[in-house]
Amino acid sequence: MESRTDLISEKQCGCTYSNPDLAVQQESSSRWLVADVESLLGLPFNDLIFQAQTVHRQYHDANGVQLSTLLSVKTGGCSEDCAYCPQAARYHTGVENQAILSREEVVMAATKAKESGATRFCMGAAWRGPKQRDIEHMTELISAVKDLGLETCATLGILKPGQAVQLKQAGLDYYNHNLDTSPEFYGEVITTREYQNRLDTLDEVRGANINVCCGGIVGMGESRTARAGLIAQLASLDPYPESVPINYLVQVEGTPLYGIPELDPFEFVRSIAAARITMPRAKVRLSAGRRQMSEAIQALCFLAGANSIFYGDKLLTTGNPDTEQDAALLEKLGLHAL
């Protein structure tokens, strides 16, 4: 296992990654250690942002932002106990259960998303994992969205062997299955699903040649070490995810995490920067929690290497800035949709 200590010592001077060879060395290394990511997170803010922006420019259009839209195609009634989730059946959050949407309803939503500028359409379902009849319905939805010329993504929970292949055959481009947090902190948030279940599902997705969308949530009461552990785990996947959504906890009344102290927004920006440095080719997505961020914090996230957002006024069951707000912010910052 190769350590990043030599690279991090160079980072202290604020010049790391101005040399492309260092970025190549970083990307080709097999693993990130938690201690090394924690050292990144502890850098002076300006140095960390500079390094992240330098890496970002080596691999991406510096001013391009990919727009994705997320739709809940089956809402509420989930049997899991994820402490952050308003869709868990055991919590009283006011979320109404909704049966899986029809093909016509999904096509209508996807058409609207495309007209608003989205290039990727993600469909989420609140269950532990899909049954075969659910997979068959999802393949119809995926094919219909694909026919509109959009990239397709689905987040359906734990996949059984063979299910990912069916989704791939229907035209699925990305499968989302987040790790949520570090292995060490995981048990504080979820007890009904093992961490290994998540890794096994990611293996199923990779085995079907579907692109991986995998990230986590920060602000759940975890330590900086735990945030470093999440990023190290993601960056050490082989290969690391093509898409990395970083969520800022949205506290929903009725969930166990409601009312905990909020994470300092600058710590969220640091997490974005560390994700960019450790996974240079990935799309790093600002996901849930943007509505509670100022425009200035969002701008810092883009500077730190975020180059994707969820676009639309709702993410599953939680609020999101509306498309007009986002369009105005992108224009203000001189950013453009990819």
Swiss-Prot record:
EC identifiers of the protein: 2.8.1.6
Catalytic activity: (4R,5S)-dethiobiotin + (sulfur carrier)-SH + 2 reduced [2Fe-2S]-[ferredoxin] + 2 S-adenosyl-L-methionine = (sulfur carrier)-H + biotin + 2 5'-deoxyadenosine + 2 L-methionine + 2 oxidized [2Fe-2S]-[ferredoxin]
Pfam family, one: Radical_SAM
Keyword Lipid biosynthesis included in the entry's annotation: no
Molecular function (Gene Ontology), one example: biotin synthase activity
Transmembrane segments: none
CDD domains: Radical_SAM (cd01335)
Cross-referenced SUPFAM superfamilies: Radical SAM enzymes
Co-factor(s): [4Fe-4S] cluster; [2Fe-2S] cluster
Co-factor binding details: Binds 1 [4Fe-4S] cluster. The cluster is coordinated with 3 cysteines and an exchangeable S-adenosyl-L-methionine. Binds 1 [2Fe-2S] cluster. The cluster is coordinated with 3 cysteines and 1 arginine.
UniProtKB keywords: 2Fe-2S, 4Fe-4S, Biotin biosynthesis, Iron, Iron-sulfur, Metal-binding, S-adenosyl-L-methionine, Transferase
Pathway: Cofactor biosynthesis; biotin biosynthesis; biotin from 7,8-diaminononanoate: step 2/2
Subunit structure: Homodimer.
General function of this protein: Catalyzes the conversion of dethiobiotin (DTB) to biotin by the insertion of a sulfur atom into dethiobiotin via a radical-based mechanism.
NCBIfam families: bioB
Protein known as: Biotin synthase
